[in-house]
Structure formats: structure tokens, C-alpha cells
Regions:
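Short beta-strand/loop segment at the start of cytosolic alpha/beta domains
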Residues: 1-15
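General small-molecule cofactor/ligand-binding pocket signal
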Residues: 4-6, 77, 99
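Short low-complexity stretches enriched in small and charged residues
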Residues: 1-3, 29-30, 106
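Conserved catalytic submotifs in the C-terminal HATPase_c
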Residues: 8-10, 47, 79, 103
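Conserved beta-strand segments of the P-loop GTPase G domain that flank and frequently precede/overlap
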Residues: 14-16, 44-45
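Amphipathic alpha-helical interaction surfaces in cytosolic regulatory modules
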Residues: 22-96
Length: 111
């Protein structure tokens, strides 16, 4: 998994490329956990995510709850169909703000 961070209209965008599984979930938890600790709105760009395991789902939920406690807006964007299907089947989509594209997510968070 590769993580890349950049700013777009006062929104921190974290792009995830590759698989989010038990081997890579701790890296995302550490990196994203720091971002939602109070730096403003955060968009998680999942457009290059290849696979999402139960460990990845767990980390996303933990980070979602941390963002809520900190008052940080967190949006997931650009999910491939397979990733969206996993999140929908498990009910995880209900916990997150979701945007179809990164641009739409940034626009919503910057408003």
C-alpha cells in the first residue's frame, strides 16, 4: 500500500493505493489517525485501492470514530465498485460521508 498526502482547497487529501489488509492497516491507522487529530477536513481518496479486508474495515471504523470525537470532517471518495460493494454489504457506508469523486468530495468539504 502507498499513501500520498496533499492539500486541495484547505482539505487534506490522503490517497491510498494498493490493498488495505492486516499487513497494511496499521500504517493507515497511524497516518490517518494523525490527520484526523485536528488539522481540518480530511478526504480519503480510495480511487486506487485494490482490496479491502476486514482489518481494513476495522481501521476505517476506528478512524471514523476518532474523527467524530475530534470534530474532524472525514469523507471517503472515489471508491472502486468492489470496495464500495464490500462497504455496502457490511453496512459500513452508513458511517461515512461518501463522494463519488475526489473533486466532489473536496468541494463538499471546502464549502
Amino acid at each position: 500500500m502507498r499513501l500520498e498526502t496533499h492539500m486541495d482547497s484547505d482539505v487534506t487529501v490522503l490517497a491510498v493505493a494498493g490493498s488495505l489488509d492486516s499487513a497494511t492497516a496499521p500504517d493507515l491507522r497511524e497516518h490517518l489517525g494523525q490527520l484526523v487529530a485536528g488539522c481540518g477536513p480530511v478526504l480519503l481518496d480510495l480511487s486506487r485501492m485494490l482490496c479491502l479486508s476486514s482489518a481494513g474495515l476495522r481501521v476505517l471504523l476506528v478512524i471514523c470514530r476518532q474523527a467524530e470525537r475530534n470534530g474532524t470532517l472525514l469523507t471517503l471518495a472515489g471508491m472502486p465498485a468492489e470496495v464500495r460493494a464490500v462497504m455496502a454489504a457490511t453496512g459500513f457506508l452508513e458511517f461515512f460521508a461518501v463522494a463519488d469523486t475526489v473533486a466532489a468530495g473536496v468541494q463538499a468539504l471546502a464549502a
